[in-house]
Amino acid sequence: MLQPKRTKFRKPHKVSYEGKAKGNKQVDFGEFGLMALEGAWIDARQIESARIAISKRLLKTGKMWIRIFPHMSLTKKPLEVRMGSGKGSPEKWVAVVKAGTVMFEIANVSEELMCEALRAAGNKLPIKVKIVKKGEAN
């Protein structure tokens, strides 16, 4: 699964996913992309399951780009622990995805196969998504 090799700080502040994306809003590398319509923290496991769903349908013919990476660690305190006494230990790595972010891109495959693969990947993610074409205005 995806996670940073090293970070400057182990326990970052929580970053908000509200609002619209400032960058990463259009399809740059492939022909079609999967765009988030709402913001969320996307877990490394969810990114991996979406990647597997796409690669199963591409059948070694197409090319895929993952445009998001889980840079931020989410912490959690153990069960039945009283409040206070510091922040919990890092539990998982998440990518902060805002509305309008292109998360996956695909190229070199027929349009039907691309749409099927991106739809399958969208079903693995906890947010509403749409399939966008290269050059489409957002």
UniProtKB/Swiss-Prot annotation:
Keywords: Ribonucleoprotein, Ribosomal protein, RNA-binding, rRNA-binding, tRNA-binding. GO terms for biological process: translation. GO terms for cellular component: cytosolic large ribosomal subunit. PROSITE patterns: RIBOSOMAL_L16_2. InterPro entries: Ribosomal_uL16 (IPR047873), Ribosomal_uL16_bact-type (IPR000114), Ribosomal_uL16_CS (IPR020798), Ribosomal_uL16_dom (IPR016180), Ribosomal_uL16_sf (IPR036920). It comes from the Bacteria. GO terms for molecular function: rRNA binding; structural constituent of ribosome; tRNA binding. HAMAP family: Ribosomal_uL16. Part of the 50S ribosomal subunit. Binds 23S rRNA and is also seen to make contacts with the A and possibly P site tRNAs. This is Large ribosomal subunit protein uL16. It comes from Ureaplasma parvum serovar 3 (strain ATCC 700970).
